């Protein structure tokens, strides 16, 4: 990669976070933050073998928004370096059917997938002075569907927040990469039927790394990525589907 400074993965056990860590770790310290430090030993060993100068794990609960600033400060202290790449990869899919009747579950989805993301992105944009922040929107937020409107609404809100944050960071030396992937075939969606233009965590990570590399420099540019690229055309077609038909669309 050639990037200097520390790499922070918030959501260290996530499929996409792990793939990005593998591609961005060479020659730099890495901090893997997740809810509990278990389950990351294998990735830690792999990153060290791939050229990371050090790999630290950090317990982090996204729902504890009051701890977010302290988590970032602790990550920088563990790495012994300024954080120059931060990947916000935590999140939950939740259970749509349950959320329709259980307000606490609906709130949990909104908290982790929207409010906690806004909090963490705000802290990162305030603390970091250069480099890249990576956030994950989704095709699910492009137009809410009956089948997943709770999760989709969080992604719609997050996407809007990221567009504004990207404009705020323009010319600052810090850039925001907002990924809008389609259905991601991974551990979070295990057992679900893939949608058209589905992608794997590996494909998402490749696209994000390419965007980071293309925007490197003293004035990196923020970018929004449709992954895969043909998904952008499908997204615009989705906007044209009449609502009586749209409300019956599957996830």
Predicted regions and their residues:
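Catalytic Tyr-X3-Lys loop
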Residues: 102-119, 158
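Conserved glycine-rich cofactor-binding loop
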Residues: 13-14
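Residue(s) in the substrate-gating loop at a strand-loop-helix junction
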Residues: 138
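Rossmann-fold cofactor-recognition segment
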Residues: 47-66
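Conserved glycine-rich Rossmann-like NAD(P)H-binding loop of the short-chain dehydrogenase/reductase
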Residues: 27-43
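C-terminal helical subdomain
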Residues: 178, 193-236
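Conserved mid-core segment of classical short-chain dehydrogenase/reductases
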Residues: 73, 85, 91-107, 147
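Active-site helix of classical SDR
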Residues: 121, 154
